[in-house]
Curated annotation (Swiss-Prot):
Pathway: Amino-acid degradation; L-arginine degradation via ADI pathway; carbamoyl phosphate from L-arginine: step 1/2. InterPro entries: Arg_deiminase. The gene is arcA. It catalyses: L-arginine + H2O = L-citrulline + NH4(+). This is Arginine deiminase. It comes from Streptococcus pneumoniae serotype 19F (strain G54).
Length: 409
């Protein structure tokens, strides 16, 4: 195996190294009135969410997997005072601060934090207005007066524990994504600094998508089925135009993939990413949410004569997957066993969002009892974790993890 720092040529190869983000104070800055703005449906209890996340990380370590943390990698990337200052300025520029006085006060607050990881975690948590010096009434501008009841000078980033989405590892390359919502697009700044300045990863990884692009793509829609085949979702969060840009870059940079299967499915929050309805769990097995099957369209995309060739596939999905993966037969394991009530409940609680850590070995939430029983009946080994608080953000084990290294299969 090569010594390249990023090696992800499948969804199922034995996981060697993975990046997580331990939920932090950003969750304590979630408020009922602003949940929709911050892409949440409920407010997790931070203390229990951290316990659940720590248990998730330990379960991975118990399987011999090295666990990295986003906040540590980002802090390690601030390798000089100049890079640190640049990071603060980019963070401020992207924070949608409308008045100069507030920006000056926040800059002073951030420069006053000397520890790099503490600085990174503060940028993640957001900044309440009460943390800043009060602006005298006579010095307030119209923005201050109109937005006087809004509590934040800079919004928190509560979705950060879903490390799958801001960037995606593809082969030896990275797709540094432009995300669906402004509140999440700021998250990609940490990936930018990791892959530009980190002592291990900085300058050593090709980017096949860039956060400065103007069309949207998220890592939950990017699946590496094999060393030859990718699957990409056209979803609520990922535009078809982004997929075309990504694929041209992948093919031109010779990242190693020969074909992409583009999955077009229902555009709604329930099915926000492909990996919320479809994941690979073994050489010949996938979980799937039955509700997407009727309206699913799959397109095969290749690169010939310096242009994309796109063909809509009309056949059976299992047969299409078997053909592209070189296996005799593919089994589609339906979330909830196909029962309409169990399927809807367990998909909402991420029953289809499995993290495969080796062929036939998957991490799942323990709460999805119907789907878990079926997976075990298919011969899979399940590592069950609690997620009563983590699931409130609408993401499962795959959403909460970004593989950096897998063994070849």
């Amino acid at each position: 195996m090569s010594s390249h720092p990023i090696q992800v040529f499948s969804e199922i190869g034995k996981l060697k190294k993975v990046m997580l983000h331990r939920p932090g104070k950003e969750l304590e800055n979630l408020l009922p009135d602003y949940l929709e703005r911050l892409l949440f449906d409920d407010i997790p209890f931070l203390e229990d969410a951290q316990k659940e996340h720590d248990a998730f990380a330990q379960a991975l370590r118990d399987e011999g997997i090295e666990v990295l943390y986003l906040e540590q990698l980002a802090a390690e990337s601030l390798t000089s005072p100049e890079i640190r200052d640049q990071f603060i300025e980019e963070y401020l520029d992207e924070a949608n601060i409308r008045d100069r006085q507030t920006k000056v006060a926040i800059r002073e607050l951030l420069h006053g934090i000397k520890d790099n990881q503490e600085l990174v975690e503060k940028t993640m948590a957001g900044i309440q207005k009460v943390e800043l010096p009060e602006i005298p009434d006579e010095a307030k501008d119209l923005t201050d007066l109109v937005e006087s009841e809004y509590p934040f000078a800079i919004d928190p980033m509560p979705n950060l524990y879903f490390t799958r989405d801001p960037f995606a590892t593809i082969g030896n390359a990275v797709s540094l994504n432009h995300m669906f919502a402004d509140t999440r697009n700021r998250e990609t700044l940490y990936g930018k600094y990791i892959f530009k300045y980190h002592p291990v990863y900085g300058g050593k990884v090709d980017l096949v998508y860039n956060r400065e692009e103007d069309t949207r793509i998220e890592g939950g829609d990017e699946l590496v089925l094999s060393k030859d085949v990718l699957a990409v979702g056209i979803s609520q969060r990922t535009d078809a135009a982004s997929i075309e840009k990504l694929l041209v870059n992948i093919f031109k940079k010779n990242v190693g993939f020969k074909k992409v299967l583009a999955f077009e499915f229902a555009n709604n929050r329930k099915f926000m990413h492909l990996d919320t309805v479809f994941t690979m769990v073994d050489y010949d097995k996938f979980t799937i949410h039955p509700e997407i099957e009727g309206d699913l369209h799959v397109y095969s995309v290749t690169y010939e004569n310096e242009k994309l060739k796109i063909v809509e596939e009309k056949g059976d999905l299992a047969e299409l997957l078997a053909q592209n993966l070189g296996v005799e037969k593919v089994h589609l394991i339906r979330c909830g066993g196909g029962n309409i009530v169990a399927a809807a409940r367990e998909q909402w609680n991420d029953g289809s969002n499995t993290l495969t850590i080796a062929p036939g070995v998957v991490v799942v939430y323990d709460r999805n009892t119907v789907t878990n029983k079926i997976l075990e009946e298919y011969g899979l080994r399940l590592i069950k974790i609690r997620g009563s608080e983590l699931v409130r953000g609408r993401g499962g084990p795959r959403c909460m993890s970004m593989p950096f290294e897998r063994e070849e299969v």
